[in-house]
């Protein structure tokens, strides 16, 4: 499965770079649906609130840590297989 997770990481990187190009969104949706049929979900926590109690991501904090932290960049997505996190997301977090 490790190779499959690497494919998901690459697909997620492409998706984040092509987010504004709507003609590609249909293909990404089809890929996600295929993974879901195999019991694998992946998501990007971009712009979500961050707290140190989150267990689904590993964060690198830039700037000063505050009580209002937000995920500003996703290096790797969170991958969940059959309800269990198999890859924690790697993210950059900034204080607001």
What are these regions (language model features)?
Residues 1-18, 26-96:
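Extended, amphipathic alpha-helical stalk segments that mediate dimerization
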